[in-house]
Amino acid sequence: MALQPAAGAKDLNPRQVETNRQLTERLASVYRLWGYDEVSPPRVERLATLMAGGAIDSSDIVRLVADDPLGLRPEMTASIARAACTRFADRQRPLRLWASGTVFRTRSADEGGQCIEENLQSGVELFGVSGSEAEMELLSLLMASVQTLGLQTSQKPRLLLGHTALMDLVLRPFNGAVRDQIRTALIDFDRLAIESFDLAYAEKTRLLSLMDCRGTPDQVLAQLSSLYGEQPVFDELRRLCTHLASAAQAQAVTIQLDPTFQPHFELYTGLVFQLVCDGRSSPVVFARGGRYDDLVRRCGATDDRAFGAGFSLAIDPIRELISDLDAAEQQQSDVLIAFSTASNLESAMERQRSWHEQGRTAVMALEPLSSMQEAELQAKAQGGLQLDWVDP
């Protein structure tokens, strides 16, 4: 029986690897323009760090058999926050960092047992900014990243915004286990669960209406103001969405506000967001982020520095969404250098060197071929390569 990769692991072909590299390099060039410095957090971390003080469930973490409780990172934010609060504690704030790398998560496989999901991510983290100016910079940077990726209007990119303060307003009348159950039902968009709770009719009706309360920021904030009166978070969101409107419109990104939108990771303590596109068969989340001040505080930051926010982009889904990654590079085919029986490998390799000096990819047919027609067939079989036939 042929050996197979572990469930959830991926064997990428050369084209996929090259596309991933181009995507990460494009994003890196944008991050650098905004003053972000690259870091490389470890793949292996202590479970205490990976669980982000309880914000990330241990069942999401791939554990390692070791003397110390170690695991593979399910995301990079916690590791970067730890480094920012220890190794980079003396650096000037705001501290701007970016990283790319593989993350690992576990889930239950359809046939039972555990499945390891392996994904490539690229993202940024901004530390030391307490106000909404951090979110304004990050979302502007996200729009610049979308621009360099070249998403199509037909993919209908949508930026979904939420805020923990909005969810707190919704959950304010409830306490204890009921509050947690309602929060889970709202996040999962589980109307049946809401209807099954032992709540007053008016409370059920309000919760069900809030599940449908998503749309343009102006519309949603007007509806929330009628329910809860004016709140400081409303002004913060208005300012943010007004600032973001022109950049989002330029990239054909629709902004939606949803008071019940929250990630399952209880990592965030302010604004949360996701960028979603229409995939081939279903919507695809390819960017997510938000503010995580509590995590920075757990990592040891003093109260005057315990501020952090960031986002990550999922490279693998982006690769599948984008078909025309780099038309300029695709217009030039790689070169196949083939030589006849009347020539020799040494002469062909001299020709190869001249192509390399021009910056072109050129590969060798290492054995002589009987005719140019045979060489043309080989070039076609290898993906339509341009033929350089060496025949004295």
Curated annotation (Swiss-Prot):
Keywords: Amino-acid biosynthesis, Cytoplasm, Histidine biosynthesis. This is ATP phosphoribosyltransferase regulatory subunit. Pathway: Amino-acid biosynthesis; L-histidine biosynthesis; L-histidine from 5-phospho-alpha-D-ribose 1-diphosphate: step 1/9. This function is generally fulfilled by the C-terminal part of HisG, which is missing in some bacteria such as this one. Heteromultimer composed of HisG and HisZ subunits. Required for the first step of histidine biosynthesis. May allow the feedback regulation of ATP phosphoribosyltransferase activity by histidine. Belongs to the class-II aminoacyl-tRNA synthetase family. HisZ subfamily. It is found in: Cytoplasm. GO terms for cellular component: cytoplasm. NCBIfam families: PRK12292.2-1. One of its GO terms (biological process) is histidyl-tRNA aminoacylation. Pfam families: tRNA-synt_His (PF13393). One of its GO terms (molecular function) is histidine-tRNA ligase activity. Its main location: cytoplasm.
